[in-house]
């Protein structure tokens, strides 16, 4: 990629400031608003927070992993950092758009890159109805919660909850229960990315439920609607020999 203006973002309280200082010496970085690419140093959480913060700028992000897992990041390679960016490949992620209503009638909207989840707020299991494209598909699910994951997010919380990993270009979404009690053997569904999923919370007084879109949490929710949106495409840059597609395939074989 022909990228000449690069911005740098990192956590000022990072325990890796010595490494970050070395990276800062490599290039004359510009302001974020002027950049053609944004380098984010840290882990997946740091990258997700900054994507949410700057996604409206429509600038590609290149993550450098100094965290733990770093699934959406590139490995640290200080010596070849700029060359790797120039030779990088682009993965386009379409986030989820969540609309949630709480018990007071307040409406919240949020975007999620990985997943939208709903989960019980107390020791009582959650109860909710599931509609897909306006058609009731499950009259009552009793569980700790449920989530809708994008292909990029399918290897995160979704995988831990027992959901499948989706290829990045699959145009599918995962609908996965979290510790389903009834129906006990239901393991979720694979839906087209064009689907609109609605969760209607049952018995909200006795069984309160919260909802999250990535790291954004909303309390005492009565219903949640989730759908994929192409209005806010997110561009992630990956080293040519370390693409996100390859990582998703590797994850399916325990890599």
From Swiss-Prot:
InterPro entries linked to this entry:
ATP-NAD_kinase_N, ATP-NAD_kinase_PpnK-typ_C, NAD/diacylglycerol_kinase_sf, NADK
What is the name of the protein in this document?
NAD kinase
This chain's source organism reads Rickettsia felis (strain ATCC VR-1525 / URRWXCal2) (Rickettsia azadi)
Relate the protein's function as given in its record.
Answer: Involved in the regulation of the intracellular balance of NAD and NADP, and is a key enzyme in the biosynthesis of NADP. Catalyzes specifically the phosphorylation on 2'-hydroxyl of the adenosine moiety of NAD to yield NADP.
Q: Which reaction does it catalyse?
A: NAD(+) + ATP = ADP + NADP(+) + H(+)
Q: Which biological process annotations from GO are given for this protein? A: NAD metabolic process; NADP biosynthetic process
Give binding positions for NAD(+). 44-45, 49, 114-115, 144, 152, 155-160, 216
- A single Gene Ontology CC term: cytoplasm
Which PANTHER family does the record cross-reference, listed alphabetically? NAD KINASE
What is an example of a GO molecular function annotated in this UniProt entry?
A: metal ion binding
EC numbers listed for it are: 2.7.1.23
> In the UniProt entry, which residues are flagged as the active site?
44 (proton acceptor)
Q: Where in the cell is it found?
A: Cytoplasm
Q: What is its main location?
A: cytoplasm
Cofactors (names): a divalent metal cation
Q: Which UniProt keywords apply?
A: ATP-binding, Cytoplasm, Kinase, NAD, NADP, Nucleotide-binding, Transferase
Q: Supply the SUPFAM superfamilies for this chain.
A: NAD kinase/diacylglycerol kinase-like (SSF111331)
Q: Which NCBIfam families match?
A: PRK04761.1
* Cross-referenced Pfam families: NAD_kinase, NAD_kinase_C
Q: Give the family, as the similarity comment puts it.
A: Belongs to the NAD kinase family.
Q: Which ranges form a coiled coil?
A: none
């Amino acid at each position: 990629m022909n990228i000449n203006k690069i911005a740098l973002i990192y956590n000022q309280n990072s325990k890796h400031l010595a490494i970050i200082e070395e990276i800062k010496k490599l290039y004359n970085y510009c302001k974020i608003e002027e950049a053609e690419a944004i380098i984010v140093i840290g882990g997946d959480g740091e990258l997700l927070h900054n994507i949410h913060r700057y996604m409206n700028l429509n600038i590609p992000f290149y993550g450098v992993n100094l965290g733990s897992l770093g699934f959406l990041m590139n490995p640290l390679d200080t010596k070849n950092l700029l060359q790797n960016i120039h030779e990088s490949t682009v993965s386009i992620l379409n986030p989820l758009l969540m609309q949630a209503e709480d018990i007071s009638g307040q409406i919240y909207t949020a975007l999620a890159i990985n997943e939208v989840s709903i989960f019980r707020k107390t020791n009582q299991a959650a109860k909710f109805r599931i509609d897909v494209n306006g058609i009731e598909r499950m009259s009552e699910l009793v569980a700790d919660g449920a989530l809708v994951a994008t292909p990029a997010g399918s290897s995160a919380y979704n995988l831990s909850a027992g959901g499948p990993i989706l290829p990045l270009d699959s145009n599918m979404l995962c609908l996965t229960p979290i510790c389903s009690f009834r129906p006990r053997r239901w393991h979720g569904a694979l839906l087209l990315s064009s689907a609109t999923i609605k969760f209607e919370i049952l018995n909200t007084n006795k069984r309160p439920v919260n909802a999250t879109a990535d790291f954004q949490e909303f309390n005492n929710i009565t219903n949640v609607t989730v759908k994929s949106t192409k209005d806010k495409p997110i561009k992630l840059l990956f080293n040519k020999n370390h693409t996100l597609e390859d990582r998703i395939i590797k994850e399916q074989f325990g890599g």
